[in-house]
């Protein structure tokens, strides 16, 4: 009985270890993508935006250009994440012929009228969070709780649903983000297609 308990503890993984495995997973350093964003308002009216996104240095630098609809064409967003400094974020608004600087205090603002905030467009730094595996299930999913330490955030925590799909390869399937009162604020679902 003692041996069985020892082996079970030997193979148990901490929340921090799981977060580090996710952070180190294979991913492209530079990405160029053409995306469609569909916004649906409370009256179920839809607005479709088309955009190009280019990310470099593990998404620490990102540029987004909006192509459609015509009234949003030319709007662009630039993000440069910095270590030990506030991130640099700005939007070019061609209708006003000016830039809008996004300050740290504005990171919870909506991005282009969507449910995404500017904070959602930034990478999370492992050292800025405390991690706990709050449960696992029979389907092999881990539920990882990430709680911000002292950083300014619109969130009190995130709960991420993760699965090991191959030996040492973990994929995020879903994430719930909670506001400062611990109410569910956002649910993100990630779909993958093998090509």
Q: Which residue stretches match the model-derived regions?
A:
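N-terminal export/membrane-targeting signals
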Residues: 1-6
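Sec/Tat signal peptide C-region and signal peptidase I cleavage site
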Residues: 7-12
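N-terminal mature ectodomain segment of secretory-pathway/periplasmic proteins
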Residues: 14-94
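A short, amphipathic edge element
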Residues: 45, 121-133, 187
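Short, ordered beta-strand-loop transition motifs
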Residues: 55-60, 83, 133-141, 194-195
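Gly/Pro-enriched, hydrophobic low-complexity segments
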Residues: 78, 109-111, 116-124, 138-195
